[in-house]
Amino acid sequence: MRSDTITQGLERTPHRALLKGTGLPQSEMGKPFIGIATSFTDLIPGHVGMRDLERFIEKGVHTGGGYSFFFGIPGVCDGISMGHKGMHYSLPTRELIADMVESVAEAHRLDGLVLLTNCDKITPGMLMAAARLDIPCIVVTAGPMMSGRGDAGRKYSFVTDTFEAMARYKAGVIDDAELARCEENACPGMGSCQGLFTANTMAILTETLGMSLPRCGTALAVSALKRRIAFASGERIVDLVRQNITPRSILTREAFENAIRVDLALGGSSNTVLHLLAIAHEAGVELPLETFDILAKETPQLASMNPAGEHFMEDLDVAGGVAGVLKQLGDKIHDCPTLMGLSTKEIAASLKGVDEEVIHPLSNPVKKEGGIAVLFGNICPKGAVVKQSGVSDKMMKFTGTARCFDSEDKAMAAMMGGVVKGGDVVVIRYEGPKGGPGMREMLAPTAALMGLGLGDSVALITDGRFSGGTRGPCIGHIAPEAAAGGPIGLIEDGDTIELDIPARSLKVMVSDEVLAERRARWVAPEPKIKKGWLARYAKVVTSAHTGAITTAE
């Protein structure tokens, strides 16, 4: 075992002494050493329940014949960090998390890892570490929050109800009392935000990839089932160490295609494009951005999930969860191994039935195409991403007038000040991985558009990204980004922009000659942040179309 490096032989006397200083008995010295990477924090509702799950994982490890050690991993809440300087840090923490897990596991020669995670960037960061290390690992996602409850049976969703409520209040649609009800009821307790936002989408994709146990992706944070899954994951990691089953044997090209199809079928968060590309890179799997669009054209959307639809995670779990989606997709799914031991199709076949009001059959899809589309054009020669499941039929094709802003903050001020009107295309740039830096989420602007009643008359394009809670005609991940000299930085107020999602096209209607003249005048702006982690990040991060990964090149 890897841990023999620190437990066996005369030369390791000092190492054993230090381990015994933690309370480790001599009798446990030869057992598999299992690291429990926990992202517990009481700053985030998605992570406040992890102390309980830690105990169940620990019990499982010891029942399985291993010896466990806890180590801490940071977590950032995208909701709390939204709309201010904090959002610059969200995506970069994904890289920090992967590096921290790698560092602790390698420094202490751990034999296997249980990765306890939940919210947006923590789960992909953990998966990136697992793929990079390629030692036995299993993921436990802490589970979704229950929907909020209001008067007359109303259900509240944190993302759609609170962020859009601000704009509705500003527009006079709701009063002080209703705004207060939203705030009080939107988050009833522990768990990740209730709809198919980034955290829950990534939990579902983790299960689909085979890196967590069945139902882990949808079992509610408050459920006893989640605790049993945590215990079983602790037991299972010891078996994985003994059998030397490692992540790269699970994270194959076919497994990634399964994850993309499930993502498309559910209408999941567009952030998953960034994360799956990054995880695939760590796993040594070639996964071009175009793969998402190729699969979208042949994978219908089978569920109508909040934020764009009516169903919450609690509904999806009861309807059949990930296994239910796999079952409905049928032959579109590859039969891949999972950490549980059963194959993907064996897990799907074990499900007795599916609630087809929630997870539709292929014969009766919600939409003919999957939830994510990849666009190209003279604004985005290396690609852009739109969550088409959240776009109304009216806005699938749209021509409008450019209104340009060089930051999210300036765009928000204009929207809330009534400057943006129907027929506009809001262009938010210099918010990409390098330019942001950190590729901030644009939930506040998109929620403002919906709340102000402009969702069917204004489009938004950006080299930043969007929250899983975003809905409406919002195109992100534009590559190359403005800070790298991308064409989005050459658009001027008054230009005509043509969006055609069915044709996968996004263009500014000016000639190549005009764009060349503008490029000759373009000057790269000064970095917004010149010291600290974000300054270093901006120098090494790649484009959105490659997953916004950091490289040594």
Swiss-Prot record:
Transmembrane segments: none annotated. GO terms for molecular function: 2 iron, 2 sulfur cluster binding; dihydroxy-acid dehydratase activity; magnesium ion binding. InterPro entries: Dihydro-acid_dehy_C, DihydroxyA_deHydtase, DiOHA_6PGluconate_deHydtase_CS, ILV_EDD_C, ILV_EDD_N, IlvD/EDD_N. It is an enzyme of class 4 (lyase). Pfam families: ILV_EDD_C, ILVD_EDD_N. The active site is at S467 (proton acceptor). Its EC number is 4.2.1.9. One of its GO terms (biological process) is L-valine biosynthetic process. The keyword Disulfide bond does not apply. The modification N6-carboxylysine is found at K121. Binds 1 [2Fe-2S] cluster per subunit. This cluster acts as a Lewis acid cofactor. Its cofactor is [2Fe-2S] cluster; Mg(2+). Keywords: 2Fe-2S, Amino-acid biosynthesis, Branched-chain amino acid biosynthesis, Iron, Iron-sulfur, Lyase, Magnesium, Metal-binding. Mg(2+) binds at D78, D120, K121, E441. Pathway: Amino-acid biosynthesis; L-isoleucine biosynthesis; L-isoleucine from 2-oxobutanoate: step 3/4; Amino-acid biosynthesis; L-valine biosynthesis; L-valine from pyruvate: step 3/4. The keyword ATP-binding does not apply. Belongs to the IlvD/Edd family. HAMAP family: IlvD (MF_00012). Homodimer. Functions in the biosynthesis of branched-chain amino acids. Catalyzes the dehydration of (2R,3R)-2,3-dihydroxy-3-methylpentanoate (2,3-dihydroxy-3-methylvalerate) into 2-oxo-3-methylpentanoate (2-oxo-3-methylvalerate) and of (2R)-2,3-dihydroxy-3-methylbutanoate (2,3-dihydroxyisovalerate) into 2-oxo-3-methylbutanoate (2-oxoisovalerate), the penultimate precursor to L-isoleucine and L-valine, respectively. This is Dihydroxy-acid dehydratase. The lineage of its organism: Bacteria, Pseudomonadati, Thermodesulfobacteriota, Desulfuromonadia, Geobacterales. The gene is ilvD.
